[in-house]
A protein has these predicted regions:
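Active-site acid/base region of carbohydrate-active enzymes
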Residues: 2-25, 31, 38-87, 116-178, ...
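Active-site-proximal structural scaffolding
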Residues: 19, 49, 70, 99-106, ...
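Solvent-exposed loop and edge beta-strand segments that line ligand/cofactor-binding
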Residues: 37-50, 91-103, 164-181, 224-242, ...
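Hydrophobic alpha-helix feature that most strongly marks membrane-spanning transmembrane helices
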Residues: 82, 118, 142, 194, ...
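Non-catalytic C-terminal accessory modules of carbohydrate-active enzymes
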Residues: 207, 214, 291-394
Length: 394
């Protein structure tokens, strides 16, 4: 059986029926990976991994007004915490397994919930748990404010070139991925602490993030390639690192555009698989290149060409043919294409910034805490057109 989600979205792009089919496959995948809790997949582990769950929660918030599964996943993360100070990689589970990177994504998932659904009284109760995780990470900071080699499994993506999903790292750490993920999480936590928690903790997190930012460019920037390397010795480069450099604002403006273009064009980089495309596509939008989004859906087109009716865990050879972490188009068709996004906690402000690419006509509706948001765009041959927005009252 599956959790009784009700899809409250609409989407139409005349002449581009492939996009509607992608949404159908994604929603089917998301539904099959949720019953009592979210699951990574319905056949193999059937476990709620918090790295997967961040994406699953965003799919839920963009496609349904039901908050239960999202809030339950966040709470299960808290219930999984151990005395060491981090969450388990997945929960509920009778086996203690730790993916230290997933504890960071768990905090980011809480920030997502705060931004899109609010629930500030509940979120305030989570802040002590977030402090534990961030304090656990703080112990691994070196004097130069770069992380040493973070223990446990630091899974990032099943990318060819990573060792069992872990990024390229040196024995001393010096890992851009570790540092950028920690910076992102610190700044999300600082926003929550400033608004609903302890401003002194917000200041503390911002101080660490600021000092860490000072190490990123000297250690990892390669001006000859217009890219950030994965390690200080520059022995590896990945799309993952450069996507996070854009998302954290380490690179901005024209430089970020160059970095994004190089990240997409240079095939020698370690490539994101379907999971981390969530972050790559967000970086595409953040760099100002969101109009290229439709051109970067090949990994999903390839799976459709194989006849799959759910999204696989990773490109062939894959094990699981149904993995919800690949259903991020069910977020980004609304957030990137239609440009509907939250601009304040609880979705109290709505930002509209479409990236239509080659589309001449597209429309859609998503649920909102106060009702729904609809966007309708039509362009003529000269690229001129109209936009109609229907916003909820209040």
């Amino acid at each position: 059986s599956a959790y009784p989600f009700r899809n409250e979205t609409t989407f139409s792009a005349p002449g581009h029926e492939e996009l509607g089919r992608m949404l159908e496959i994604g929603w089917r995948t998301a539904r099959l990976c949720a019953n009592e809790t979210y699951m990574d997949c319905p056949y193999y582990e059937q476990l709620q991994y918090f790295g997967d769950t961040r994406i699953q929660a965003m799919i839920s918030m963009y496609n349904t007004s039901d908050p239960y599964m999202v809030k339950n996943a966040i709470e299960q993360g808290r219930q999984s915490m151990v005395a060491e100070g981090i969450t388990m990689s997945r929960y509920p589970s009778s086996v203690h397994q730790f993916i230290s990177s997933f504890s960071l994504w768990w905090i980011c998932m809480g920030h997502d919930y705060w931004m899109y659904r609010g629930d500030e009284a509940y979120m305030k109760t989570l802040l002590p748990a977030y402090r534990q995780v961030l304090s656990w990470y703080e112990q691994w900071l070196k004097p130069d404010y770069s992380l040493s080699y973070v223990p446990h499994w630091f899974f990032v993506d099943w990318a060819a070139g990573f060792d069992y999903g872990e990024p390229i790292r040196e024995k001393e750490g010096n890992s851009a991925l570790q540092d950028l993920m920690y910076i992102m999480t610190l700044e999300f936590a600082a926003e929550m602490e400033q608004a609903i928690g302890l401003p002194t903790m917000a200041d503390h997190y911002r101080k660490i993030a600021t000092e860490m930012r000072k190490t990123i460019r000297p250690k990892y920037w390669d001006a000859d390639r217009n890219l950030f390397a994965d390690t200080q010795d520059h022995r590896g480069y990945s799309q993952h690192v450069n996507a996070l450099a854009i998302l954290t604002g380490v690179t901005k403006g024209e430089e970020a555009v160059k970095v994004m273009n190089q990240t997409l064009a240079d095939t020698s980089l370690i490539q994101c698989t379907i999971y981390f495309r969530y972050y790559l596509n967000q970086a595409l939008k953040a760099s100002g290149l969101g109009d290229q989004f439709l051109d970067n859906l090949q990994i999903w087109r390839d799976q459709m060409a194989l006849g799959l009716t759910t999204w696989a865990e990773m490109p062939e050879p894959s094990r699981s043919d149904c993995h919800a972490w690949g259903a991020s188009p069910n977020i980004e068709f609304y957030r990137i294409l239609l440009g509907i996004d939250s601009d304040a906690p609880g979705f109290r402000k709505i930002r509209i910034a479409p990236s239509l690419g080659k589309l001449k006509e597209v429309s859609g509706t998503i649920p909102h805490p106060l009702g729904s948001v609809t966007a309708v765009y039509k362009l003529d041959e000269r690229g001129e057109g109209t936009a109609r927005l229907v916003l909820p009252e209040g």
